[in-house]
Amino acid sequence: MQIGIYSSQSTDTAAKTIKKILDDNGIKSFSATKLKGKQVDCVIVLGGDKGVRNYFHRTFDATLPILGISEGEASGFLAQIDLKEFRTYVDVLKKQKYTVEEVPRLGVKIDGRNVYPVLNDVAVFSSKSAILMEHTLRVNGEEVWHDNGDGII
């Protein structure tokens, strides 16, 4: 088994902790920034929900399962395991006894052009203030809302 670890500078200490736990359990791991050409079973993303959103913003790869890990007291929606609990989940990872939950991404078009896919929300505003814009919200291709305003979240 091989696992990528995605972290930011603020989570480097946590990344070292995760790497040590994985090494101690015979699981190969390396920085997710060095994934190119390597086969991995999943990617561990540090930094809570923000870290998960940053990962998907920077990598557009939605094919690999990710495990979001938070370092705070509260678990999030996208990162549901706390760093303090990670050691208890290693065996589950090793035996691949987990289920992958598909989280739908939002597709956004501005002036008919696709922009980056997003996870849970998007804000669209004019580059000039107080400009009226026309918005159409479609869910699975079906129009559910149409309005004018100075922006939309």
Residue map of PLM features:
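Residue-level preference for short coil/turn positions at secondary-structure junctions
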Residues: M1, K38-Q39, A62, E71, ...
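ATP/NTP phosphate-donor binding region
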Residues: M1-L46, G51-R58, I81-V100, I110-Y116
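A short, gly/pro- and small-residue-rich
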Residues: Y55-E71
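Catalytic core of DAGKc-family lipid kinases
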Residues: G72-G151
